[in-house]
Swiss-Prot record:
It comes from Neurospora crassa (strain ATCC 24698 / 74-OR23-1A / CBS 708.71 / DSM 1257 / FGSC 987). Pathway: tRNA modification; N(7)-methylguanine-tRNA biosynthesis. The gene is trm8. One of its GO terms (cellular component) is tRNA methyltransferase complex. S-adenosyl-L-methionine binds at G105, E128, I129, N163, T164, C183, T261, E262, E263. Belongs to the class I-like SAM-binding methyltransferase superfamily. TrmB family. It holds the Pfam family Methyltransf_4. This is tRNA (guanine-N(7)-)-methyltransferase. Forms a complex with trm82.
Length: 293
């Protein structure tokens, strides 16, 4: 008589069977359990492109891929130059449009799913560092695409396992995004772990780099201290200004952000408070004219 399967083996068997059948039914979250947070400074053996131009977006958004792949040239070594050889990376299919919205730390994908029909002409990407959680969102999106094939829904959203604290500029060009969502990030309560918070002076500069002027960073948390931290760091950054409360509450995406994430629903169930703040990317200052000319 065989031994009963442990929980990990049951999870692996479930996910393997789901994918073998083509992922036509929505995945069950209990088979994708993982720790609530991951250390962003650990070596997660992540795969990332050297430059945004070398990112294979077509595998994430196949319905927006152009027909002909584009061959990517790579740097040649001295020996290859002497023999006249030129290496080429595998051909990459480009997209008909760029990703413009990023959900950093997308969790189980609640916000992605809610944004898909609201922003039907916009490509939205969820970024998540945890392996099992990323797999859940992948399977969830695949199932929703199959179930809504006639309506052509959920083709504009995707998820990518990535560490945005290290590699965000590897995926996005300067000024590519017009919206960034940071929803219920890990608060890292201990002072010695504040350097792991997803909002900091350094990271805000990276957000400013990938966000076009006029673009918005959306933040929400149920931790007052973290809310004050994020507000303080964005207010102190010269590339951002806080959006007024009136404009914030008039933005329909704020209500979606409040109510559609899994963490937001949990806060609602426990009658907790949700602290929201939006920040607009300012225009870069002009270079001073050369008075010596």
């Amino acid at each position: 008589m065989s031994e009963p399967k442990n929980k990990r083996q049951k999870r692996e068997d479930y996910r393997a069977a789901l994918r073998a059948n083509g992922v036509t039914e929505l995945p069950r979250k209990k088979f994708y359990r993982q720790r609530a947070h991951a250390n962003p400074f650990s070596d997660h053996s992540l795969i990332y492109p050297p430059t945004p131009e070398q990112m294979d977006w077509a595998s994430l958004y196949p319905h927006y891929a152009v027909e002909e792949p584009i061959e990517q040239k790579t740097e040649t070594t001295e020996s290859e130059e002497s023999t006249g050889q030129e290496l080429s990376a595998p051909a990459i299919r480009k997209l008909t449009k760029q990703v413009e919205v990023a959900d950093i730390g997308c969790g189980f994908g609640g916000l992605l799913i809610a944004l898909a029909p609201v922003l039907p002409e916009t490509l939205v990407l969820g970024l998540e560092i945890r392996v099992s959680v990323t797999q859940f969102v992948e399977d969830r999106i695949k199932a929703l695409r199959v179930q809504n094939e006639e309506q052509k829904l959920y083709r504009n959203i995707a998820v990518l396992r990535a560490n945005t604290m290290k590699f965000m500029p590897n995926f996005f060009n300067k000024g590519q995004l017009n919206k960034i969502f940071i929803c219920f990030p890990d608060p890292h309560f201990k002072a010695r772990k504040h350097k792991q918070r997803i909002v900091s002076t350094t990271l805000n500069s990276e957000y400013a780099y990938v966000l076009r002027p006029g673009g918005i960073v959306y933040t929400i948390t149920d931790v007052p201290d973290l809310h004050e931290w994020m507000v303080g760091h964005f207010n102190a950054h010269p590339a951002f200004e806080r959006v007024s409360v009136e404009e914030q509450e008039a933005d329909p995406l704020v209500e979606i952000m409040r109510n559609e994430t899994e963490e937001g629903k949990k806060v609602t169930r426990h009658n907790g408070q949700k602290h929201v703040a939006l920040f607009r990317r300012l225009e870069d200052p002009q270079w001073p004219e050369d008075v010596s000319a």
